[in-house]
């Protein structure tokens, strides 16, 4: 189109009347040139592909012939397999447990009839003794063997039938329980396992079985009435294991510089043995009094009891009707004796708060 812009009207009229010039102008256009180039490139590509395919022609023919041979071999193998399968079906039908059982029964009856016939001939005198002894024993042995085989084969035939009947009579398995959908916002609930019962006596003891040890777990709530007197025992505190402060000396006056009041002093009790001087030490009382105090007031380890036991006695619980009452007065469970040299006074109340 650009070449036609520069031409005059007369040249355009001449070009219109000249068909060769129009054809030349069309061939020289860039669009036609591009198409021509693409055509030449496609022809070259097709030529190269054709040459490459011709190179694979020989291996392709060889592979085709091999495939044909293998196919013929496959057909022969299929025919042979069909023949072997027919033979196997024929033999298997003859060797079925039911068929074998029938054949064994027939042969067993046959050999038994032959042996009976020989015995009858021997009794009639038609068969000599030597022939009868040789043949009759072998016949009877074969008859017994076949009878045993028939019995065993009958057991083998019955077992699969019994198993099939049991499998048919068995109920179908139960489906698993459906899973309940849990909302997304709700946390999963964990089921608590029941705890095993504690190995503890049904009723706690009315007294402490070990007075020198700390008090164990106490009973909560009222306990049922017991048929024996209930008392409580004090629990003594053994004190710290290390050296303690020396006790104050008994008497109107203590150590120098310390005034001792009568309320803090207690005369020695009669009946308690004294401690030798050589056995005294830090934390141990001396004979005839207590160790001098370094300035701290000390309390007496033995409270004034006034002739009563150092532990309280609890009143007897109400007993069941018809139960005999004790004729002797109540006594503490432990006999009174020398109290330990150390310890704190017993608690004012009973040791068991549940009573």
Swiss-Prot record:
The keyword Protein transport appears for this protein: yes
Sequence positions bearing Phosphoserine: 29
Gene3D superfamilies with a match to the protein in the record: Helix hairpin bin
Subcellular location(s) of the protein: Late endosome membrane
Post-translational modification: Phosphorylated by TBK1.
Pfam annotation, one family: Mod_r
Region Disordered, annotated ranges: 159-355
GO MF annotations, alphabetized: calcium-dependent protein binding
Domain VPS37 C-terminal, residue spans: 78-167
A single BP term in Gene Ontology: protein targeting to membrane
Protein name: Vacuolar protein sorting-associated protein 37C
Protein source organism: Homo sapiens (Human)
């Amino acid at each position: 189109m650009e070449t036609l812009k520069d031409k005059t009207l007369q040249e355009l009229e001449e070009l219109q009347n000249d068909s060769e010039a129009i054809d030349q102008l069309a061939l020289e256009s860039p669009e036609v040139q591009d198409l021509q180039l693409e055509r030449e490139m496609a022809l070259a590509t097709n030529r190269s592909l054709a040459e490459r395919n011709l190179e694979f022609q020989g291996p392709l023919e060889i592979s085709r012939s091999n495939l044909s041979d293998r196919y013929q071999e496959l057909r022969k193998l299929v025919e042979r397999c069909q023949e072997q399968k027919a033979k196997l079906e024929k033999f298997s039908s003859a060797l079925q447990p039911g068929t074998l059982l029938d054949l064994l029964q027939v042969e067993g009856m046959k050999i038994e009839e032959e042996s009976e016939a020989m015995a009858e001939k021997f009794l009639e005198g038609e068969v000599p003794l030597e022939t009868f002894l040789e043949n009759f024993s072998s016949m009877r042995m074969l008859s017994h063997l076949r009878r045993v085989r028939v019995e065993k084969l009958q057991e083998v035939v019955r077992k699969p039938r019994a198993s099939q009947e049991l499998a048919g009579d068995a109920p179908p398995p139960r489906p698993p329980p459906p899973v309940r959908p849990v909302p997304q916002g709700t946390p999963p609930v964990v089921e608590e396992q029941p705890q095993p019962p504690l190995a503890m006596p049904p009723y706690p003891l009315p007294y402490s079985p070990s007075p020198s040890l700390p008090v164990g777990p106490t009973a909560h709530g009222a306990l049922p009435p017991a048929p024996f007197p209930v008392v409580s025992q004090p629990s003594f505190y053994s004190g710290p294991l290390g050296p303690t402060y020396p006790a104050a000396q008994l008497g109107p006056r203590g150590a120098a510089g310390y005034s001792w009041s009568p309320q803090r002093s207690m005369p020695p009790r009669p009946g308690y043995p004294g401690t030798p001087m050589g056995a005294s030490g830090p934390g141990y009382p001396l004979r005839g009094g207590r160790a001098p105090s370094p300035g701290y007031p000390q309390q007496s380890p033995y409270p004034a009891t006034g002739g009563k036991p150092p532990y309280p006695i609890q009143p007897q619980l109400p007993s069941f009707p018809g139960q005999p009452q004790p004729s002797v007065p109540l006594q503490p469970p432990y006999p009174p004796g020398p109290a330990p040299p150390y310890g704190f006074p017993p608690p004012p109340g009973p040791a068991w708060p549940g009573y």
